[in-house]
């Protein structure tokens, strides 16, 4: 039987092992963890804007918003610590054909915080919160564009890849400006300065034009990969939901930008007097086309999930954000078209996203405590 000193040695060894595991977790941390922010943030946004509200729902959204901010800064601190201690890991991450694609999750997760500031804080705190969100949005837009332009070029010049090894994760760095453009539409709608709003939406249209067509190109390549090489490995099968992300968020973004254009263009005498109405109508029309295109990709994803078992990993957060932004387009169409059908669909999708968030968040916490996600 161990003596008192023996027990002390055992405890010290256990403490050292725990510290070693913590450092291993930090060392193995990668940008994909910011998908937790994406999923948590979009769930808060959906609950805050649910077409059919009930008492207390707003407070649930506020709790998720606060939780999302805490998680974001926690992950940001870990990331800074990781790259400060091991600078070579940053270069290794950029050179990694999979981890570099996950860089897009950082600005997209940040965008959900900006949107929540508009939806939750501005009605309470007033115009200064809108201006604060506007400043944050410029940071998010800059990072999103940098990632969208840089990472695909790395894919062309540095990464070793093939059609067979491709997954829908190729979309992640490209979707970041789509999310930023949609977020810009939300922020611009809250700005009282029409000139600032005009500048914002014009930048958003350019970002949308940079990213959405390129995302369509990736979708064509991805469909070819599926047709020639069949479904992706089961470990990455949840990524089958990613294609509905740019379609849903792109559609929502165009509608939201159109709403702001219809208000701001006539006030500033920008283009023709009818220009704002044209932007609004064309945005709604293109959004419907994109939403319909998203439906068939949603079907492909759901059908893929039935083809066999797949086990939990951090990629399961793709159950939340892509469907979540598709839902924002759905609820926005319900609002703009005054359609009960889209309101009901948006509510249904929102409930599904919230349920998926509860499941994936619980599994993430459990697997993090057991250190399984850091191995």
From Swiss-Prot:
User: The organism sits in which domain of life?
Assistant: Eukaryota
Could you tell me where this protein is found in the cell? Answer: Cell membrane
Main subcellular localization, coarse class? membrane
> Which InterPro entries did the record assign?
SLAC1/Mae1/Ssu1/TehA (IPR004695), Sulfite_efflux_TDT (IPR051629), Voltage-dep_anion_channel_sf (IPR038665)
Q: Pull the Cytoplasmic topological domain ranges from the record.
A: 1-25, 81-101, 157-167, 222-234, 299-309, 365-375
Q: Which residues lie on this side of the membrane: Extracellular?
A: 47-59, 123-135, 189-200, 256-277, 331-343
Give the transmembrane ranges.
26-46, 60-80, 102-122, 136-156, 168-188, 201-221, 235-255, 278-298, 310-330, 344-364
Q: Which GO terms describe its molecular function?
A: sulfite transmembrane transporter activity
Name the UniProt key words of this record, in alphabetical order. Cell membrane, Glycoprotein, Membrane, Transmembrane, Transmembrane helix, Transport
Which Pfam families does this entry report, sorted A to Z?
SLAC1 (PF03595)
Which Gene Ontology cellular component annotation is one that this UniProt entry carries? plasma membrane
Task: Summarize the protein's role.
Answer: Sulphite efflux pump required for the secretion of sulphite as a reducing agent. In the presence of sulphite, cystine in keratin is directly cleaved to cysteine and S-sulphocysteine, and thereby, reduced proteins become accessible to hydrolysis by a variety of secreted endo- and exoproteases. Excretion of sulphite mediated by an efflux pump also represents a detoxification pathway for dermatophytes during infection of the epidermal stratum corneum, hair and nails, which are rich in cysteine.
Family stated for the protein in its record: Belongs to the tellurite-resistance/dicarboxylate transporter (TDT) family.
Task: Name the chain's protein.
Answer: Sulfite efflux pump SSU1
* Source organism of the structure: Arthroderma otae (strain ATCC MYA-4605 / CBS 113480) (Microsporum canis)
